[in-house]
Amino acid sequence: MILFAGSEERGYFLEEPAKTKKMKVEYLGNAISIETQLTAILEKTMQYLVIDIEQYIDKADELATKIESIKRAKNCNVIIYAPGYVRESRIIQELNFRGIRFYIFAVGQADAKEEFERCLNGYYLQMDDPLEEEDRESAQKDMTGKRIGITGVCRRI
């Protein structure tokens, strides 16, 4: 089973990959703090726990500690749904430090579904550390030439 700690509207991208894997998806609904969902999460038996961290107002270190303790208690794969976040965000750094390796950063539902499928297949476990991998890739890029910045561009245009 896949448990989504968030609303059904935000986690709808889980449905198709779950059907492919013959798994059921359950939604907990929105909450301001992870504390309010903690009991419901601990009561369920799941193989994957997808947590929408955008809904919480908890401090980064407290949230990361709670998620780490849930991971240890339930012995399930925890996937963090953080649309629009970057790997350098404080919460992502805290979670990465605590051993959480699966993230969905995509903003669109189609891209989020693709990243979720990668998480299910263990794609991100093949990397030593996602941050180190990105650093190696950026170091290899040719630094000559001009760079410009563009804002407000959709990926599909």
Residue ranges and their predicted role:
Residues 1-132:
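Long, basic/Gly/Ser/Thr-rich N-terminal segments
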Residues 134-157:
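Walker A/P-loop phosphate-binding motif and the immediately C-terminal alpha-helix
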